[in-house]
Amino acid sequence: MKMVINQSDIRSFNEDGVVILRGVFSEWIETLIKGAERNIENPSERALTHHHEKYKGQFLEDFCNWRAIPEYSDFIFNSSLASTASSLMKSNSVQLFHDHFFYKETNSGVPTPWHQDMPYYCVSGQQTVSFWLPLESREKSVSLKLLAGSHQLNKEIRPTSWASNESFYEDSEAFM
């Protein structure tokens, strides 16, 4: 199924900072699951395994693996990822910053904390897109939650370690 991004999607993304695009990458889910399985079996040296007394299962985070995991590379270069990003940003070109993989076991009890992606990155700018593609169903209590308009707040949300809630930066006053 090929889904075309429409003007309403673009307007929602630009006004709200978020848009749900159901089914856009549905034909890629099986490929991405194979890549995720490969990633879990052989995490990179950048991988983080989060531990917390409330976590009941594995919580693995890994990134920048698209060169090592062929399924990720295939998705990045052969799906509509770039054209979808380009449409949403109203841009003639896009650049890949990185891939980011989160693996939470089904009953891990690991909620996704409130956050914005930009404070974690070593880049700045307004024309950025992050795609969240769930490969399996999860309980709502541990799923990603989005706050429309948060990209227009006066301060960014303080970036923290997801396991310890410790700030990434010393200057916490710069953040909410």
Q: Positions of the model-derived regions?
A:
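Non-heme Fe(II)-dependent double-stranded beta-helix
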Residues: M1-D16, I20-W114, Y120-C122, P159
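Short loop segments at secondary-structure junctions
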Residues: G23-V24, T106, L135-E139, S150-H151
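Glycine-rich, phosphate-binding/catalytic loops in enzymes
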Residues: R38, S130, A163
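Hydrophobic, well-ordered secondary-structure segments
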Residues: A82, D117, T128-W132
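Short, structured patches in soluble enzyme cores that scaffold and shape functional sites
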Residues: H100, Q116, L133-S137, L146-A148
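Short, conserved beta-strand element in jelly-roll/cupin
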Residues: C122-E139
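Double-stranded beta-helix
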Residues: E139-M176
